[in-house]
Amino acid sequence: MTIDYLHPQEEFLRTLDIKTLLPQQPPFVMVGKLTFFDARKIITETLVSAENIFTNAGTFSASGLIENIAQTCAVRIGYVNQYVLQRGIQIGFIGAIRNLDIYRLPKVGERITTIVEVMEEVFGMTLAKAQVVCDEEVLITAEMKIAVKEEERK
């Protein structure tokens, strides 16, 4: 059975170790699992834990939510590189954050879903629109510009 990596089935995504798609490693991993991928959209889920370095007094911080969005973008880049282009992981950097609106910070034990949609990609830059939701309640929305280094992580 061949896998269509551009339109992967849920059962394939469930088998992925998300850490293999990221340049970040524990304890700085802010995403839990990849639940959806296509050429323009990616969705991750994360359980907010008390052990997370961005959790304080039972609440996941705004910085943690922003990093969660950035790492969801990184998972997309890692997935494309590893499964579509068959190359190594590249390191990305947040170039800009615009239209950031934070409505509520999630609590320990809540499961957040991060949805990133690519608006434009050109010259190693990706402009993406993102939102993080918890039980269909929007927690944060933002636009993020990500720059990707051409060289692969060693």
Predicted regions mapped to residue ranges:
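Small-residue-enriched segments and motifs
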Residues: V29-G32, G92-G95, T114-V116, A142
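N-terminal leader/capping segments at the start of a protein or of a new domain
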Residues: M1-R40
